[in-house]
Amino acid sequence: MLSRSIGKAAGGLVLGLSVAAAAHAAPLFEPVTVLSRAAAGSEPALGKLLATPSTATVQEVRVDAAATAQPQLEFELLGQRVQAVRSKVESLPDGGSIWYGQFRSPSDRLTAATSNGQDDPGNSVILVRSGNTVTGSIRKDGKLYRLRPLGNRHVLVEVDESRMPADHPADYNQLPKIPMGNNDRIGIAQASSGTPATIRVLVVATNAAVAAYGGNMQSLVQLAVAESNQGYVNSNVGITLQLAGYETTSYTESGNFTTDLTRFRNTSDGYMDSIHTSRNNTAADVGVLLINNTSYCGLASGIGSTASTAFAAVYWDCATGYYSFAHEIGHLQSARHDIASDPSTSPYAYGHGYRYEPASGSRWRTIMAYDCSAGCPRLNYWSNPNISYNGVPMGIASSADNQRVLVNTKATIAAFR
């Protein structure tokens, strides 16, 4: 009885403080107009965005980048007025910043739906500020929106994840299984993340990808790294991903994922050879090539990797929000898809992603899982039976524990450079 009274009193205090804080939420952006293909005119990047199958709606918005210095933000998601509160902020070496936050619940209080105390991934905001531009991923009730600069304006994009490209080309089924250091934890799944590890990634974007995106590609890369790190925190992985370097390449894409990835990985074939010098100079453990191939989301060099094979290619439009950037690095650490889509037990029988598909109610999947048969959002979590989402374990100890895989292999990949 005493604890209930304290809880009610504390709840009333929190609610009162939240309502007061809400009055001071800074406007992040205001709607201007919904854009149509007729509005694209001579703007190729806008035309491409509007023609992308996964684009549900594009709205021009007026952004106040300075608002990201504030702890509470307010904005409109296609007619729905929402407020978000900051959970943390990070400074970037280039003077920019990353704003992490959560939406307020209808009662004006924050919700945390996971058993590990992390914020709800279905109601989250990550924003990268660079000068007067803001690039971000926004999830509201599981729905994905993207905020991004496009030419001399900003747009809010509503994404239909059911129409995203397939995760991989058929070549995925022939990927080599590369043994990594034998650091497997004894026994069944454990909650510990072990010794922390830092993995450094060099990101190279083709000029075609930069042109097709039409925004601040470096900010998109920083967003991909930030999302990856949030996923590691959410799932108790104990990895920090660092952006070792970002550069562009004039390499002309072949139109084939495997060909482009092979040329990116090879050190002396006359294609992108200089990136290996950059990799050594920046001490990057992993290399990721961002390309403009709309056929698929990505491809890694193997299930597992060595220092000479730790390379992946990612379609830029899948890199953030859909988490393909982290997904492909996950493959390089030996993580596999959900077991229904990817039944191989090599190198780890438990190393699969996880899909939750109840007969009724909310469906979801983790980072490495393919889409549900009836569609479901991809949450920024790795499968982990020790963590629950809305009371449901996010994995199975014997077959779906990507967290355990990443913990097993992180020291090996972090020592590649």
UniProtKB/Swiss-Prot annotation:
Zn(2+) binds at residues 327, 331, 337. Keywords: Hydrolase, Metal-binding, Metalloprotease, Protease, Signal, Zinc. Its EC number is 3.4.24.33. The keyword DNA-binding does not apply. The lineage of its organism: Bacteria, Pseudomonadati, Pseudomonadota, Gammaproteobacteria, Lysobacterales. It comes from Stenotrophomonas maltophilia (strain R551-3). SUPFAM superfamilies: Metalloproteases ('zincins'), catalytic domain (SSF55486). Pfam families: Reprolysin_5. InterPro entries: MetalloPept_cat_dom_sf (IPR024079). Belongs to the peptidase M72 family. Its cofactor is Zn(2+). Residues 1-25 form the signal peptide. Metalloprotease, specifically cleaves on the N-terminal side of aspartyl, glutamyl and cysteic acid residues. It catalyses: Cleavage of Xaa-|-Asp, Xaa-|-Glu and Xaa-|-cysteic acid bonds. GO terms for biological process: proteolysis. This is Peptidyl-Asp metalloendopeptidase. The active site is at 328. PROSITE patterns: ZINC_PROTEASE (PS00142). Binds 1 zinc ion per subunit. The keyword Hydrolase applies. It comes from the Bacteria.
